[in-house]
Amino acid sequence: MVKQHFNPTKYNLQVKISAVRSSSHCKHNINYHFIWIPKFRRKLLVGRIVDVLKDIIKGQCQELGLDLLAVEVMPDHIHLFVSAKPINNPADIIQKIKGNSSRQLRLVFPQLKRLGYPIKQYSSLWAIGYYVGSAGHVSQDSVLKYILEQQGKDVFEFNIFGGQTKIGDFTR
């Protein structure tokens, strides 16, 4: 059984995952699931820290032009689900979110500089590394079926009234 990290009904994920977004020159559906942990997997993310962290992440997503689909903060790890543009690199996304949230959280909660230890201060709240996975509404089987069905067909359809070309529909 696969563990669900996000409650699909709470976040309306089925609708959000299937939404195709538009940029100036393309249609896209790029969703990333990130997971990262505090240094030493300390159970520090509790109480008011959770609310402040969610606000920081929400603000950082807006600044980066990401659609925040879901965020869950556990005492010892964070799950973040975002929809990105094709120009957004997952490594850059997580670097900015981890760096910014570490800095801001430790300004608001100075006790996080010590990660719960009495003496030593640490330069970062988060452990090195992260998990990232991609998710979408189109399965590999759907893409393969679409490609095989397109043999001998034109790649683009042309709308004579609007003068627009459009790429075929993967969702069938």
Predicted features and spans:
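Basic nucleic-acid-binding interfaces
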Residues: 2-172
